[in-house]
Amino acid sequence: MNYLHLLMLFETIFVIGSFYALKKDILAPSFLAGCSFWLSALCVLLNESKWNVHLLKKTLLILVFGQIAMFLGDILATKVPVLRKKDKETIEKEKSMEYKPIFIQNGKNLFLFTFNTALFVYFAYSILKKGFYMNAIIDAHRMQVEDGISEMNVFVQQSFRFLIVCALVYAFILLYNRIICNKKYQHDMFYSLYFNALAIIESVLSASRRNIIVMLIAWFFMTVVLWNVKNGWQFKLSKKLIRKTGVIVVITMVIFRALHTILKGTQSNLTSFYDYVTYYIGCPIQSLNIYLQRNVQIHRSPYWGQFSLPSLMKALKRIPRSVETTFDYVYLGGGANAASNVYTFFLAPYLDFGFMGCMIFSFVVYFVLSLLYTKAVKNRNMTYSVARNTAILGFIYWITLNSFYFCPVMFVFAPTGLISVICFWILFVFLFRIRFN
């Protein structure tokens, strides 16, 4: 029996079923995760002969039941009642709410412009002080661990996170004025693009593509939420949005392909764009499969959360700093001549908590994500608190579309993730001293 074909069949049924079960909400966490797994399974199927793929029954069961657990957590969260009900006066007030454009005082814009520019220059200097050559950037990549650029100055590390927060908050302002108020302001465009460009350049200089993915998914999330608000949460998936999303995905993959060539060289046969895209998207499932082939008897991690929540556990001193919390590379097999060290969302909790623990972990993560989305953002008018929630949730929503790749929870539920959320709160207070409604 070909378990890979069964996986592809399951992914197709799962995507269609979750789409309708979750009322055609394209932002439903388990639906987005299902789409990413469907695409990953397709890329493995396209390379079945080349990679000599023989999917294990165990791999199939982990992927199938893991996604079912995600879906159950998602759909259960939609059934949780709202704890604080609105009175009639509040409901009527929100129905008649008139949205006005957001204007940020020039002094605040200039302060953040100067502050972030100065920190960016210092960051770039820290990377390139040995000379402007690619080895300096590669060295920066080697300095990274699961929690970021750990060996750099602490102030430099946190400034990077604050810059990303600024980039996303100004992206929200740009999208809000454009979508909700149908207004185009040059200063919105300038500051939003400037802060986002700085954040992307810093990501490239630190040899990390992760933050670029975080920002792109946040832009996508905020755009869809604002379109829903404008249309009374009666949003329908349009061909225009699909086309734009497709173009952005292609451009992103081209950029990632270029970064892969620059930073990792060309010691593989991933010479074509097609090979790279199918490798990048499909390798996690094959890596998981190979890991399970080589490790028939799985022994649970000696430390709770060693692989799924390493940064948090180390910060709480539940895991010694010297304990290894990352995975080694494995070759994909066959004629791939390529390696991977990403194993989908499920391997980390599987090693930490066993099969049932992995299912519970997946259920809880997607229950929390869905609860935050459905209760703090969905079907709400764009008040100050909802705007803040949208920006923060956009920042962590990359968990959904990256679940096919690895376990992003380790980065979100980490000290740096908490610092970033605090930065969102501080920046919203700084920019919007009074609520806009």
Summary of predicted features, one role per range:
Residues 341-437:
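Hydrophobic alpha-helical segments
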Residues 1-102, 106, 189-199, 215-259, ...:
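N-terminal "leader" segments that precede or initiate the main folded domain
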Residues 140-156, 247-369:
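Small-residue-enriched transmembrane helix-hairpin modules in multi-pass membrane proteins
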Residues 79-236, 252-262:
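Membrane-embedded catalytic interface detector for glycan/lipid assembly enzymes
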Residues 2-16, 52-56, 104-111, 157-173, 188-199, 351-372, ...:
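Hydrophobic alpha-helical transmembrane segments
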Residues 12-21, 201-205, 367-377:
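Membrane-helix boundary/interface segments in integral membrane proteins
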